[in-house]
């Protein structure tokens, strides 16, 4: 490892990595870091690096560059931390991928469906990273797996507050992640499943149904299977939601990261044919503060409207109150004694409540439903996209929105989220 100064006054450090080691680094706030592979071969979360190409990582990025055979890399810019580690679970993750690939080959041979894998564990154990790794390795072998995102706090297939699925056709971009060309997305409306667990489980079942339908008509998708990312809530109703997801998707393999108790509970409660595997988390996994999570969510939403590093220009326009119908999924909890005869609190959680446009809508995100009419179940209908309310004019009965596409809105049914986005940058 050597340090040198370059012309841009950015500190430049060269690292020599031995086989099966990884360089871990975090980018300082308000800084960016460039990474270049000089010799050998290396990968980031399963995506191979191109030699002599500079990759840029922005503030807050936490990156691990792994090499199977040894390499030399160069970092330019200020890192909060940068070190090489020999202690990495990559071999175990590769073994998991190899076992899944064997299952795909068997499925191909026997005209059956491929493995459906669910990755579970508490918060901050690297679930999304393991999903990305397994998907990248599969797609590099010519597979076309489906990525299912059940983590409403992260929303890596779309934005936070949603659940969705993405057909993976190429490895994730080193800087941008997976190409989100045509995801299937459902509105949940909040960043924690606990706000409406009945709706959460219903959307999980809906996603599983749609995935099954796709597998019936697309042999390649069926053989390639799916990788399911889940929330870090693993107790009580959160645990029950995991069991429900495993059942809805008829999963074959559950990868449990870093929690033996959860591993034993799932082994006990899931059908005997489900293979449950306990894997360690990587030493590079960092605990994220609430503020950091909030910033990541904001950044995710900003990227939806403005594109990666601001490559899009969103549209602002007025929408008449009379042109749209706005709903919230789930009525407020009321005492059981006040509920209509034969109705339970659970029914209340799926109820569509009309929302009257008002100033309290400002900064709220709205999902634009693909539904043609309310006779369709809005909570189980996918969404076309999202808008954010920037102002409300009660006098003229219009509200102004930020939208990724120009007017008019494709449909007139909107679902309001609890999530707010302030466009301050």
From Swiss-Prot:
**Cofactor(s) listed in the protein's UniProt record:** Mg(2+); Mn(2+); Ni(2+)
Q: Name the linked condition.
A: Pontocerebellar hypoplasia 10: A form of pontocerebellar hypoplasia, a disorder characterized by structural defects of the pons and cerebellum, evident upon brain imaging. PCH10 features include cortical dysgenesis marked by a simplified gyral pattern, cortical atrophy, mild or focal cerebellar vermian volume loss, delayed myelination, progressive microcephaly, global growth and developmental delays, severe intellectual disabilities, and seizures refractory to treatment.
- Would you tell me the protein name for this molecule? Polyribonucleotide 5'-hydroxyl-kinase Clp1
Q: InterPro entries of this UniProt entry?
A: Clp1, Clp1/Grc3, Clp1_C, Clp1_C_sf, Clp1_N, Clp1_N_sf, CLP1_P, P-loop_NTPase
Q: What Gene3D superfamilies is this protein classified in? A: Clp1, DNA binding domain, P-loop containing nucleotide triphosphate hydrolases, Pre-mRNA cleavage complex subunit Clp1, C-terminal domain
Q: Which residues of this UniProt protein bind ATP?
A: 22, 62, 124-129
**What taxonomic ancestry is recorded?**
Eukaryota, Metazoa, Chordata, Craniata, Vertebrata
Keyword Metal-binding set for record: no
Record localization: Nucleus
Matching Pfam families: Clp1, CLP1_N, CLP1_P
Recorded hits in CDD domains, A to Z, give: SIMIBI
Q: Which family does it belong to?
A: Belongs to the Clp1 family. Clp1 subfamily.
């Amino acid at each position: 490892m050597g340090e040198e100064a370059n012309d841009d006054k950015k500190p430049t450090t060269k690292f020599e990595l031995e086989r099966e080691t990884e360089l871990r680094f975090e980018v300082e706030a308000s800084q960016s870091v460039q990474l270049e592979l000089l010799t050998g071969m290396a990968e980031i979360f399963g995506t191979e690096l191109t030699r002599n190409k500079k990759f840029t990582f922005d503030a807050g990025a936490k990156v691990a560059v792994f090499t199977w055979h040894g390499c030399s890399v160069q970092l330019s810019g200020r890192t909060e931390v940068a070190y090489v580690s020999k202690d990495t679970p990559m071999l175990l993750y590769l073994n998991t991928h190899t076992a899944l690939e064997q299952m795909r080959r068997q499925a191909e041979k026997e005209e059956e469906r491929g493995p459906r894998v669910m990755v579970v564990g508490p918060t901050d154990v690297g679930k999304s990273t393991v999903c990305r790794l397994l998907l990248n390795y599969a797609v590099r072998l010519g597979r076309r797996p489906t990525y299912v995102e059940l983590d409403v706090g992260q929303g890596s297939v779309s934005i936070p507050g949603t659940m969705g699925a993405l057909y993976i056709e190429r490895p994730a971009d080193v800087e941008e992640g997976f190409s989100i060309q045509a995801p299937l997305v459902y509105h949940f409306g909040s960043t924690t499943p606990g706000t409406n667990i009945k709706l959460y489980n219903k959307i999980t079942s809906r996603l599983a149904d749609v995935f099954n339908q796709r597998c019936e008509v697309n042999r390649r998708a069926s053989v390639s299977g799916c990788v399911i990312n889940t929330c870090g809530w693993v107790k009580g109703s959160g645990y029950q939601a995991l069991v429900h997801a495993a059942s809805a998707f008829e999963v074959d393999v559950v990868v449990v990261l870093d929690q033996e108790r959860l591993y034993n509970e799932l082994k006990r409660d899931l059908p005997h044919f489900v293979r449950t595997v306990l894997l360690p988390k990587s030493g590079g996994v960092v605990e994220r503060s609430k503020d950091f999570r909030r910033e990541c969510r904001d950044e995710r939403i900003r990227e939806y409207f403005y594109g990666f590093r601001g490559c899009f220009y969103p549209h602002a326009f007025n929408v008449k109150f009379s042109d749209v119908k706005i709903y919230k999924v789930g009525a407020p909890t009321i005492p059981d004694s006040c509920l209509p005869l034969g109705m339970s609190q659970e029914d209340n959680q799926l109820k569509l409540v009309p929302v009257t446009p008002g100033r309290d809508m400002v900064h709220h995100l709205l999902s634009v439903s693909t539904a043609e009419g309310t006779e369709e179940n809005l909570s189980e209908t996918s969404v076309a996209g999202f808008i954010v309310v920037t102002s409300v004019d009660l006098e003229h009965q219009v509200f102004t929105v930020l939208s990724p596409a120009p007017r008019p809105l494709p449909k007139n049914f909107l679902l309001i989220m609890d999530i707010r986005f302030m466009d301050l940058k």
